[in-house]
Structures are given as structure tokens and as C-alpha cells.
Amino acid sequence: MGEYIGDYTRKAMELFNFSSFRFQRSIVKAMGMVKYAAAKVNSQLSLLPSDVAEAIMKASWELVEGKLDEWVVVDVIQTGSGTGLNMNINEVIAKRASELLGRVVHPNDHVNMGQSSNDVVPTAIRVATYLEVESSLIPALTDFTRLLEDKAVEYGDLVKPGRTHLRDALPVTLGQEFKAYAGMFLRDTEFLKSALERIRELPIGGTAVGTGLNTHPRFGELVVEELRRLTGLPFRRGNSFVGMRSLTDVYMVSSAMKAIALDLIRLCNDLRLMYSGPNTGLNEIDIPQEIPGSSIMPGKENPVIVEASMLAAVQVIGLDTAVSLAVNLGEFELSMGIPLTGYDIILEVQLLSGALRQLGEYVIARVKPNKERMRKLAESSTALITMISPLVGYDKASMLSKAVNIRDALRGLGISENEINRILNLKRLTEPGIITRELGK
């Protein structure tokens, strides 16, 4: 195999030398699929000689398989249509196809036949996003949610103090908290799957401005049909005028991932607080650590995976902001934020998938509740006075909470010790009911 850098790519490398950012494997793979499908369809429509089409398809599939990745070298920061990426791909495929065929295959006349960067790259980033979310993020999210649900059952009877505004509140179980976390991510999964539905429509076949000039009328429809076959995913032919000028459907996927990131930060904050200590914090849970937490304090253990997951989530939120701005670039017939949108959204998928996997494996699966500590904290909560509020009124209960603990308050109401012990069954306080109505029963 030889050198597959073409003249356009060399010039693009010189001009778009902004960063070290290069397109991810999933985007290169999707571009290869689009080129494979285009060559096959152009051959079926008798527009491209079968031997040329066969060579292009073989070279395109090598790109899909990752065999030509080293030659996809253009910077992500480039012209807003993604022409740099499209031409880099065209030239790599053309040079490899020429090698396979034994004569010249042209990057524009043959590989790019019936296509424009303006419809190819928006199509590829939708395909890449759908593939990456379906194969990576949804499985990671599903496994993570299931793990939280399992822990909710396991910790169903472990009572701990509830807290609102970081102040004492009525007791809850650790299981109830984990069930709530699971519910958050279940909701996020539904949002993500709904957003995926929006990127099923592909604009391929619109060529330069959406009209489809210089392509066969059936080209777009047949390419999408082939992409369905290659991916096993439910793509359909969309309105090219819409899909080329607007990427807000892609942004919906980014927005769904931002929601996951926000809930991930929320969960991680609670885990850090429960793990705080061991002697000067809450110390309600223990999280076995794999590496030392400090380079100067011997024996110090820190929630390193929890914090790393939070950093990943923060980065996702930042990327979502970038995507929201990128999809708004452009005028009239074409979006001008296509390559950056594609790169950022795939990075969001990768970061979230990794964070969910690592947090699940190294934290959620290994959490060890400090049962006695949680029980003592729950029993000492000033909010327990809430249970006698229906009996003595809010104002008196409020005064009692500042003066005595709940046990003394109940004694002051003339309630026997046996009855007090029955009332102060903390597990009962985590369930619906009016405890004072049961006094004397």
C-alpha cells in the first residue's frame, strides 16, 4: 500500500493547521460507508463503470475497517461545510482504488460522483452519531441504570438521614436514594432515544444546495437504502433542504447528552458528600480506592473516579454549548458548523460512555454503606420532630425542635417508652402515613 495523500489534502493540511484535532474513527467509518453506498448505487444506475465502482467499494470498505485511517489527516477546524474532510476521503479512496484497479480513479469524477460535501458530510455525521450512541452510550447507560436499580433493592432497608438544603430532613433509605438516581437515568435514556429518532433522516442526494442537480433522481433514496443495509439502522431519506441547512436535529442528541451529564454530576456530588470524612465528614458510605489520593498525605483516599466522571460530564456540557453555537452558523442553503458539530458530538458520546462505565464498575458496584453511622445520624436528625407536628401544631413543634430531641418531646406528651420505641422505628418513617394517628392503637 502506498501514499494516499492527494493535492487537495496537502493544501488543506497547510491552510487548516489550527489544532491537533482529527476526526474520530466513527466519523471516518461513516464517511467510508457513504462512499461505498454511493459507488454501488452509481454503478446500479449505470453511471459508473462496474470495475471502477468495485474498486471504489473495496477501498471504501478498507476505510470502514480502519485500514486507511492514517491518511485521514485534515484538521477538524476547517471550512464549515466539511469539504476538507470530504476531499481527504475522496483522495484516499481514489488513490487506493487506482492501486486496486490498475488505472486512475478520479476523486471528484468517480468517488464523489453525484455528491457534494454539503450533503455527504451532514449525512455522515448523522450516521456516525446514531451508530456511536446505539453501540456505546445506550448500552453503557442501560448497564449503569440497572446497577443503580440493583443497589436500590440491596439497600432497601438501610435508613439514613434525609437532607434538604444540606440540613437535617426526614429519614429516607439508601435504597430510595439509589432508586431515584436510577429513575433519573431512565428518564434520560428515554430522552436520548427520542432524540435519536430525529437524526434518522439523511440529506444525501441534495448535492450543493438541496436541489439534487448533477445526481440521479433516485440516487439519494437508493444510497439511504444501502446505508440501512450496511448499518442495520432505520435511516430514511430526508428533505435535503432541511438536513443541509439545519443541524438542530443533531443538537437534540447533544441536548439529551447534556441532560445525562447534569444528572451524572448530581449523582456524583451526592456520592462525594456521603463519602466525605472519614472522621470530619458524613462518612455514610465507603468506596474502595485503587490508587493513593494524595502525593503528600499518606493513607489519604479520595473519590478519584467520582471526580473524573464529573470532569467528563463538565466537558460534555461545554461541548454541548459549542454544538449549540456551531449548528447556528451558516446562512441560506447550508450550515457552516458541520465538521465541528460532528467532532464535538462524537466526543460527547465517548466521554459519557466512558464515565458511566468507569463509575459503574469502580464506584456503584463497590459502594459499602456504613450502616451504623447512617442509623445514628438518622436518629439524631432534628427533623424527626415533624412527626408530632400534626398532634401539637407546627409552631409548637418548631419550638420543641430547638429545645429537645424527639424522644424527650414524645415523653413530654405523656407517651410511654414502649410506644416511643414503636414510633421511632425509623424504617416506618420512610413510608407514607401519619404516625401520630397510630398512637395508642
Give the location of each predicted region:
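Conserved, well-structured ligand/cofactor-binding cores
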Residues: 1-441
